Amino acid sequence: STAVCTYTVFLRPVPVTCFEWRCGIRQNVLSLWLCLFLMMGGIFFWGIAIAAFVFFTLLVLSFYLENEPRNVLEATALTPSLFLNRKLIRHTGYFALALLPFCCIAFIHYSYWVYTLSAYFAALNLFVFGILMKYTYYRPNTYSTVRSLIISAVGLLSLLLPFAGIVFVANLFLYYSALKNLDTYFYAFD
């Protein structure tokens, strides 16, 4: 059977290595469409775009709450630092591209361009925080509700500009904690 679902069209540009995105798009396709329409509503009112932006950021972060099996992690045959660097660069790049329609609203509401760019970089910072939290507390085949609460709380705090710096500093510490934790799963590839 070669039945094609509607979301399959959206999955074609997403590489197989970004399985979190593929799974998340499949599970949240209606919510993603809602975010898209709300962002388009931001053309008329900037506050609607901000609400859609926050909702979209938290929705994409939910893609990273479930940990992959250990064999998927080991199939990459990379060192922990190379694995984590590739994951951060690729996935943050895709997230940055997904947020570009929101940044286009800054051209329409040009008086809010500083807030728009600040929110954009705060979201990227929070996204890196979410990925690093996943691998800092990685256990194969688990789902973390505690991690989702922490990410949501930090996400709301990082919207306030002074707290974005704290999240950035926390990312530095989480990076080394994630490397240390992943080292137990990649011991054969060092």
Language model segments and positions:
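Short helix-to-coil transition segments within interhelical loops
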Residues: 74-80
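Hydrophobic alpha-helical transmembrane segments of membrane proteins
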Residues: 1-70, 84-190
